[in-house]
A protein has these predicted regions:
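C-terminal motif of bacterial Sec signal peptides marking the signal peptidase cleavage site
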Residues: 3-6
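N-terminal secretory signal peptides
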Residues: 8-60, 122
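Helix-rich interaction surfaces within compact, conserved domain-sized segments
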Residues: 66-125
Length: 125
């Protein structure tokens, strides 16, 4: 008696992150030097060296950090360094575990436009 089993396999974590990064990147503007920072509402891991940080419900920043940043992919929580209530590229860091990951680039994300696109996609399914 032979047993045939099949399991549905969806995209793995890296593929999901790559897809999410593509979406965030499409709605991200040009690089900026810094952004105002008072509190972090949420964050989304988008790859080994990429993440989106939400500072308000409809305000997010796409960050790229420089290696080494080995703990980011496995982080449960992160923090950001800041100076005078601003986070600056090439000066501040994403703090995760024992890593201090230098922020290489900051891009503002048009969260409202991203949400509109998602609603349109869900409406057409």
């Amino acid at each position: 008696v032979g047993v045939l089993s099949s399991c549905a396999s969806g995209p793995g974590p890296r593929e999901r992150m790559a897809t999410q990064y593509e979406r965030y990147s499409r709605f991200a503007g040009d690089a900026v030097a810094s952004f105002p920072f008072f509190t972090m509402q949420n964050w989304v891991l988008l790859g080994q060296y990429r993440l989106a940080v939400y500072t308000k419900v409809n305000e997010a920043w796409l960050l790229e950090v420089s290696p080494p940043c080995s703990d980011l992919e496995f982080a449960q929580a992160i923090a950001l360094s800041s100076s005078v209530s601003r986070v600056s590229a090439k000066f501040d860091h994403v703090l995760v575990g024992r890593d201090r990951c230098p922020i290489k680039e900051i891009r503002p994300v048009d969260v409202r436009a991203m949400k509109r696109e998602r609603k349109l996609e869900q409406g057409s399914e």
